[in-house]
Amino acid sequence: MPQMAPLLWLNLFLMFSATFVMFIVLNYFIKVPSKIEKSSSQLQKMEMTWKW
């Protein structure tokens, strides 16, 4: 069985690395961020009256 030359291994590694990086970059940029609606009920401030 013939063995692969070191340059072929390097070429194979570079191709897989480039494919992996492109996959990660596309997954990062393809998602559209969803807008979070601010509701005033979540931002209510609790006030405590202290009786000393």
From Swiss-Prot:
Q: What does this protein do?
A: Mitochondrial membrane ATP synthase (F(1)F(0) ATP synthase or Complex V) produces ATP from ADP in the presence of a proton gradient across the membrane which is generated by electron transport complexes of the respiratory chain. F-type ATPases consist of two structural domains, F(1) - containing the extramembraneous catalytic core and F(0) - containing the membrane proton channel, linked together by a central stalk and a peripheral stalk. During catalysis, ATP synthesis in the catalytic domain of F(1) is coupled via a rotary mechanism of the central stalk subunits to proton translocation.
TM region positions = 6-26
Name the family: Belongs to the ATPase protein 8 family.
Q: Which domain of life is it from?
A: Eukaryota
**Protein name from the UniProt record:** ATP synthase protein 8
What cystine pairs are annotated? none
InterPro entries listed in its UniProt record? ATP8_metazoa
Description of how the protein assembles with itself and partners: F-type ATPases have 2 components, CF(1) - the catalytic core - and CF(0) - the membrane proton channel.
A GO cellular component term found in this entry reads:
proton-transporting ATP synthase complex
- Which terms under GO biological process does the entry name? proton motive force-driven ATP synthesis
GO MF annotation list? proton transmembrane transporter activity
